[in-house]
Amino acid sequence: MNKCYIEIHSTNKAKNDIDILMNRAGYRNIGSSKKPSGKIGKFFVKLGIILKIPFCLHKNEILLIQYPFKKYYTYLCRVAHFRKCKVVTLIHDLGSFRRQKLTVPQEIKKLSHIDYIIVHNPSMKRWLEEQGCKVPMGCLEIFDYLSETKAIDYCPVTSVPQVIYAGGLGPRKNAFLYQLDDHISSYELNVYGK
């Protein structure tokens, strides 16, 4: 069974890393290899992808879609099923949490169009199940970003335990970071992000 994915260049590192990993794993890109510039460029590249998808999918393929896929998600799922393909979605974030543009029932309905969901952790899986999601799910458990930097083989133990956080630093999405002083005074916190 052949596998494919839709590459849509994003400002989101996690999504871009998944595109790279899918390519390395032999998945066929049915998206765009062109990196658009500006809102109008992005709109036309995405529109081109949406229009060509029905002609790029082959019977019995597995299509991986990264979520959120803001527009045309349900359309893509329907086209893939019409072409007798299986649809797998890797969830990075849920719209009902992220910006509350979707209600929880709307999101669950949107996700009901797929065959399998890959979630980040058991908590996300449990939450989706509690909200009525019936789609089979698997957990990544941990998501590591790709890096050109060579990993350190040995890290010396320090007298003060260290906690390292890498990710978004904005208070809107990560308010807990601004409340840690009250809880981890005996730890050294190293924060990486913007």
List the model feature ranges, each with a label:
Residues 99-102, 114-137, 174:
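A short, active-site helix/loop in glycosyltransferases that binds the activated sugar's phosphate group
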